[in-house]
Each structure stands twice: as structure tokens, then as C-alpha cells.
């Protein structure tokens, strides 16, 4: 089968790889000059299935009000003048109940755990290298309230059989030796030893090369204008003056997916703006060895070979990609507070990207009401974590195979109501 994939981020490239491995003739189209040059370029570097959780959580609405008055708040909201933004935020609020949080987190962990299994198999099969580490993830708590609040996450981890360790301040150094110097600032930590880290952009670039070796064609610097529709099906992709035709089409355009398919259906994927800095390591003993999550500031600090990546925060501001100095200040403050002297933040590069987020946190993967159109988008902050599993799942669906995990609650249909032949957003 001929398959066209729109988007060459980590999700699109993973989809291409698994589809090609299944025997399909795959073409990837992207406006950028190469793979992973947008949202996948400088993310936090985490592969964290156990920390797969929706931003829509109990207590978040009240926290959001509090964060409005804090200098280093992890969340900021600025109205972008669109009705869609207001609808999306309302849908997100509807998912902040304990019941919805448990459902959403459960299916996110399911996909993320499966994706890690797919990544491990990929690594065993191909030997792909991307500055990867398997030292786990350590979530740090700065207050007793945060530590107590982790109980609901631990319950979900137990139910999903995800290994974890609850560490006292004195035990944190066993996972991250450099934290011994700052343990007095912390009340404890939750460690997931099965999590991994690495450079997502490097991973995506090398996976694209592997996909090319399987026959995948990458068409970069190519405009993606619209979907051509005929007889209730997709007849092609309009790319400038050319129409590219296939048997099946996959939309993996991240935050841009919503506008691209708006004439066919309304999907609630909104850009959640995040930031990162990448600093050279100057003192190995003072640097992290894997990934640390600061629960207070919602910031991840990740070790690469000779670099430290610090990323996080969320701004609901539309498609604004302006770099804001105050956000860099927060990232530098966080890493220097926990790992003083480990990296030279004065020499750090500064980046921002738009994560494609759904109101319930779960990505949209699978079939759509249009028979030959498939979606693989809306992974939020977990694009790399879920990429391999999403790609394999999509390849199975397109190939007519039963996926290895439950997939019906991942499709766009959880958000669509059929009304007189039209589709409109519904609550997940």
C-alpha cells in the first residue's frame, strides 16, 4: 500500500519506519529542510512512560490561579483571540476531575509503556544510538504536600505494574550523587528506574536514515497546502502545484494538525508552548546522571553525554514562538539550584517549541471518519516517549492487523459526535 505521512518530527518518522518495515511504500512530506527541526528539535530528552500523565489534573485549576502571581510559574495563559482556545481550555477543565484523571493517565501509561517496549526492540534490532541512557527518572519534591500528593500517581503505577522507588532526602544521592549537596532543600523523590533519556533530534535523524534504508522517501522543503477530497475519501495532498497521491494518508503535523484537517473535522489539538536550554557540562561530579523532574517548577533536567538539557513549562498563548528571557531565567535558576556548578548556563543555547496537546492529555492515534485518513498527533510533552508505540500501532491498523494494545480509546472518535454528517468536538 502507498502511504503518505505529513510531518517529519519524531512521531512522523517513527510512523514511516514501522510502516516501511510492514512492507508499505512510504513517502514523508515536510516543509522543513530535514527531520526533527520543529517540536522534536530540543525537547526535554525524556522517555518517561511512568510519568505519562495529563496536565489536566485535580487541583490544577486552583494552581493555575496561584501561578498567575508567581515569577517562576510553570504555566502561563494569554488569550490569543480565538474561540478555539477558550473551547480547548474549557474541555481541559472538564478533564480535571479525579475520575477523568485516572482514566486519562491509565491510557497514557498504557501507550507509553508499550512504546518503550517498541523502542527497546528497535534498539536491539538496529543498534541505533542517540546519547541514550537507561538511568531512570527521579521526580523531586520540595514540600510534604507534594510528597503526599504523589500517592494517587503511585496507585496508578501499581495498577500498571510500573516499578518505582520512593526515596527519602538522604536516599536521593543513591540515584543522583550530586543531589547530596542540596538534599536539605528536598522532602523526597519518586524514582522510576525503567525510564530512559537521550537526544530526540539525534534519534529522529538516525531513525529517518534507517527508514530511508527501508525505502522510505523523504520530501523536505515541500509545502503542504491541503487535502484533496473526492467521493468522501482523500484523493491526494496538494503540495504547491503538485498533488501527491497514495492509498492512505497520515497526519502527523503536531500542533498544525488542527487547522490542516479543519474542513473535515474539528480536533482539539492546541499548541502548548515550552522552552529549553542546553548547557555544556563543566563539572561531572556536580552534574546529573539521568533525568530529574522538579515538581515545583515542572522542569526536567536531563543528562546527555557532555551536555545538560533543561526543559519544561507551558504557555497557552497560541502559535507565538517568541523566546522570552524570563523563561530562560527560570530554567537557569532551576538547574543551578539543584546542580550548582554542573553546567555552564552562560553558554547555553535557548529554544522554544509548540507541543501538540489534547484537553485530556491522550494523543489522537488511529482511524478517522474518513476511511483512508489516519491521525498520529496530540502527544503533548510525550511525543518521544510515545512515538515508537504510536508508530507501530498505526502501522498495524493500516496493515489490517490487531494492535498489541487496546487502541479504540486513542482514536479521534472519542472527541467526535456525528451530527447530520458533520463532526464536532465532544468531551473525552
Swiss-Prot record:
Q: Which family does it belong to?
A: Belongs to the DadA oxidoreductase family.
Q: What is this protein called?
A: D-amino acid dehydrogenase
UniProt feature coiled coil, ranges: none
Annotated Gene Ontology cellular component terms: cytoplasm; plasma membrane
- Gene Ontology terms describing biological process: D-alanine catabolic process
Q: Which residues cross the membrane?
A: none
Q: Which HAMAP family match?
A: DadA
Group of enzyme by EC: oxidoreductase
Q: Which GO terms describe its molecular function?
A: D-amino-acid dehydrogenase activity
Function, as annotated, reads: Oxidative deamination of D-amino acids.
Q: Would I find Repeat among this entry's keywords?
A: no
Going by the entry's taxonomy, the superkingdom of the source organism is recorded as Bacteria
Provide the reaction this enzyme catalyses. a D-alpha-amino acid + A + H2O = a 2-oxocarboxylate + AH2 + NH4(+)
Q: What keyword terms does UniProt attach to this protein?
A: FAD, Flavoprotein, Oxidoreductase
Please give the pathway this protein is involved in.
Amino-acid degradation; D-alanine degradation; NH(3) and pyruvate from D-alanine: step 1/1
* Matches recorded under NCBIfam families: PRK00711.1
Organism whose genome encodes this protein: Burkholderia vietnamiensis (strain G4 / LMG 22486)
EC numbers, comma separated: 1.4.99.-
- Where is FAD bound in this sequence? 3-17
**Which coenzyme or cofactor does it need?**
FAD
Amino acid at each position: 500500500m502507498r502511504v503518505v505521512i505529513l510531518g517529519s518530527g519524531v512521531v512522523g518518522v517513527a510512523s514511516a519506519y514501522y510502516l516501511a518495515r510492514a512492507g508499505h511504500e512510504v513517502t514523508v512530506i515536510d516543509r522543513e529542510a530535514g527531520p526533527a527541526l520543529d517540536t522534536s528539535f530540543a525537547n526535554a530528552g525524556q522517555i518517561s512512560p511512568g510519568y505519562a500523565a495529563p496536565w489536566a489534573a485535580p487541583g490544577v485549576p486552583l494552581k493555575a490561579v496561584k501561578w498567575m502571581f508567581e515569577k517562576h510559574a510553570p504555566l502561563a495563559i494569554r488569550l490569543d483571540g480565538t474561540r478555539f482556545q477558550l473551547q480547548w481550555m474549557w474541555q481541559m477543565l472538564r478533564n480535571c476531575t479525579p475520575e477523568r484523571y485516572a482514566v486519562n493517565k491509565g491510557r497514557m501509561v498504557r501507550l507509553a509503556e508499550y512504546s518503550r517496549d517498541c523502542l527497546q526492540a528497535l534498539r536491539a534490532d538496529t543498534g541505533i544510538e542517540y546519547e541514550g541512557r537507561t538511568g531512570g527518572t527521579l521526580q523531586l519534591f520540595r514540600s510534604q504536600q507534594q510528597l503526599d500528593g504523589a500517592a494517587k500517581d503511585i496507585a496508578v503505577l501499581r495498577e500498571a505494574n510500573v516499578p518505582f522507588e520512593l526515596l527519602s532526602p538522604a536516599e536521593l544521592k543513591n540515584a543522583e550523587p550530586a543531589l547530596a549537596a542540596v538534599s536539605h532543600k528536598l522532602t523526597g523523590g519518586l524514582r522510576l528506574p525503567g525510564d530512559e533519556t537521550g537526544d530526540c533530534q539525534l534519534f529522529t535523524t538516525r531513525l529517518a536514515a534507517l527508514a530511508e534504508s527501508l525505502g522510505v522517501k523523504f520530501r523536505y522543503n515541500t509545502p503542504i497546502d491541503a487535502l484533496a477530497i473526492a467521493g468522501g475519501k482523500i484523493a491526494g495532498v496538494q503540495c504547491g502545484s503538485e498533488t501527491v497521491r497514495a492509498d492512505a494518508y497520515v497526519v502527523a503535523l503536531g500542533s498544525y494538525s488542527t487547522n490542516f484537517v479543519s474542513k473535515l473535522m474539528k480536533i482539539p489539538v492546541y499548541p502548548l508552548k515550552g522552552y529549553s536550554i542546553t548547557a555544556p557540562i563543566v563539572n561531572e561530579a556536580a552534574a546529573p546522571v539521568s533525568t530529574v523532574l522538579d515538581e515545583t517548577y515542572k522542569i526536567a533536567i536531563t543528562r546527555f553525554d557532555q551536555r545538560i538539557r533543561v526543559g519544561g513549562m507551558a504557555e497557552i498563548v497560541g502559535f507565538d514562538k517568541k523566546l522570552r528571557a524570563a523563561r530562560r531565567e527560570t530554567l537557569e535558576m532551576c538547574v543551578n539550584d539543584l546542580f550548582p556548578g554542573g553546567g555552564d548556563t552562560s553558554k547555553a543555547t535557548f529554544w522554544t517549541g509548540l507541543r501538540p496537546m489534547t484537553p485530556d492529555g491522550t494523543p489522537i492515534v488511529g482511524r478517522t471518519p474518513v476511511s483512508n485518513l489516519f491521525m498520529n498527533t496530540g502527544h503533548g510533552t510525550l511525543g518521544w516517549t510515545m512515538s515508537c508505540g504510536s508508530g507501530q500501532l498505526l502501522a498495524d491498523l493500516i496493515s489490517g492487523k490487531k494492535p498489541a494494545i487496546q487502541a479504540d480509546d486513542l482514536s479521534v472518535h472519542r472527541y467526535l459526535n456525528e451530527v447530520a454528517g458533520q463532526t464536532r468536538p465532544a468531551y473525552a
